[in-house]
Amino acid sequence: MLIRTSIKTINQKLKDNPSWNTLDIGCGYHEFKGKINNLIGIDPYNDAADICVPLLDYHPEERYDAMLALGSINFGSTDKIFAELEHAVSLCNPGAVMFFRANPGLPHDKDESNWISFYPWDANFVVNCADQLGVDILDIRTDSHKNRLYFVWRTK
């Protein structure tokens, strides 16, 4: 299954670079805390985060070598999504690796999540954003189980 492969890839890349500072955007319950060195998790709604703040309001002094956004940049208009991507890129050092999982606009399986509207991600949008933001695309693929879009960027 692709998600397991993606998580293994992320874990291996971060284990191979233990000195990297890593940002987990929308970390939720912060499940990677203690598993990834030098990890900072931000989330506007979950107290398990290191810092409870929306992405666009996060302005740290340091920059990051790796970034995770595994389902957190999924809500709002095209302009909001692009602004969040642009801000995420600005938080990274040159050569940083950015791992994303995006919902292509599909509803969640759980009834309590039916009210959530997801941005309709597709590969063309990812490519266009990468071009506009000046990042390299290292990988892009779709999960065959839940149709999530996975992509990896590298900053220049």
What are these regions (language model features)?
Residues L68:
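A conserved beta-strand element that flanks and buttresses the S-adenosyl-L-methionine
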Residues G76-S77, C92-P94:
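Helix-to-beta-strand junctions that scaffold the AdoMet/dcAdoMet cofactor pocket
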Residues S72:
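Hydrophobic adenine-recognition pocket in adenosine-nucleotide-binding enzymes
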